Amino acid sequence: MSINVFWFLPTHGDGHYLGSSEGARAVDYSYLQQIAQAADRLGFGGVLIPTGRSCEDSWLVAASLIPVTQRLKFLVALRPGIISPTLAARQAATLDRLSNGRALFNLVTGGDPEELAAEGLHLNHTERYEASAEFTHVWRKVLEGETVDFAGKHIQVKGAKLLFPPVQHPRPPLYFGGSSAAAQDLAAEQVELYLTWGETPEQVKEKIEEVRAKAAAKGRTVRFGIRLHVIVRETTEEAWRAANRLIANLDDKTIADAQQAFARFDSVGQQRMAALHGGKKDNLEISPNLWAGVGLVRGGAGTALVGDGPTVAQRIQEYADLGIDTFVFSGYPHLEEAYRVSELLFPHLDLATTELPTQRPATQPQGEVVANIYVPQKVSQS
């Protein structure tokens, strides 16, 4: 089975060491452009752009990189409860049109109540998933060309519609990750690809089976993806030295402070990530070649595959055998590691070819919208 491999744009910072200013790098637009163009040239299918108050805005970053890339797809965040689904659908269609079908969307419910409150979202975990389900229903229908009336507990719209459709038909794919039962229910019912953070193959297998069964009960099928860091070198010994060097400047206080901050999250996925290492720097290899050191101070994806190219490829195949077809990778620093992954790992993988959609007629020349209501149609000649 061919696999899709994405890279990552570090809009929240980059460097040679975790939790330290030593070896840090200025992450400005020129640097992000370098990474995006490298990923484009090296054969990555797309890039994940992170979201949250610690990051640059993912939509603006993606839009700015469209003209300087050719085939690279952009996986950007949808934030239910922070933006209306109708506006989000219009923005999604615009990004898809501007990029000629290179837009992908990642539904992010959020897991930090403190950050969400700062955004104006004051819902508990259960309510956020209720709102996310309603948001996604409206967003999908509007993008698919329907005129939507919807009266839910959290979302109410009347006459929501889209005048300018996306390039991808019926709409761009929707990605989503979450480990709670509510998250799995949402994935089974409404998304195209369910993402998991890099847990052990046994844990990932269990999650896939649960989501697959829930989707089947609704008459649907769901694709699967995984989010991991990668530390690949010419030898496995060298790769492990690089992993240990990445956390060489971490002290116990920095780790404890980070884990205390993560403890306030109500994200089940973040809790599962934290349980893999317990806040300790010893015994970080939690499964063969799967290292939990990144999660000592980094929220979200906290594990890395470590080894030489053939070894890492073997571990990737183990996940692929579970049904995963999309791998979202990253590494520190992200520019150099993109090249290492391409040179040392890609030769051992069966990579999917990036296919771009042909332009739909709706993206061709048209007259100005009449009274902000409809697009004038070409009159047929009799």
From Swiss-Prot:
The GO biological-process annotations, alphabetized, read as: alkanesulfonate catabolic process
Biological role stated in the UniProt entry = Catalyzes the desulfonation of aliphatic sulfonates.
Report the SS bond pairs. Answer: none
Q: Report the protein name in the record.
A: Alkanesulfonate monooxygenase
Gene3D superfamilies from the entry? Luciferase-like domain
Q: Which organism is it from?
A: Yersinia pseudotuberculosis serotype O:3 (strain YPIII)
Q: Which chemical reaction does it catalyze?
A: an alkanesulfonate + FMNH2 + O2 = an aldehyde + FMN + sulfite + H2O + 2 H(+)
A Pfam match: Bac_luciferase
Q: Which residues form a coiled coil?
A: none
Assembly, per entry? Homotetramer.
Q: Which family does it belong to?
A: Belongs to the SsuD family.
Q: Does the keyword Zinc apply?
A: no
* Record keywords: Flavoprotein, FMN, Monooxygenase, Oxidoreductase
Q: Name one GO molecular function term.
A: alkanesulfonate monooxygenase activity
Keyword NADP on entry: no
Stored InterPro entries: Alkanesulphonate_mOase_FMN-dep, Luciferase-like_dom, Luciferase-like_sf, SsuD_RutA_monooxygenase
- CDD domains xref list: Alkanesulfonate_monoxygenase (cd01094)
Task: Cite any additional comment in the entry.
Answer: FMNH(2) which is absolutely required for this enzymatic reaction, is provided by SsuE.
EC number, as in UniProt: 1.14.14.5
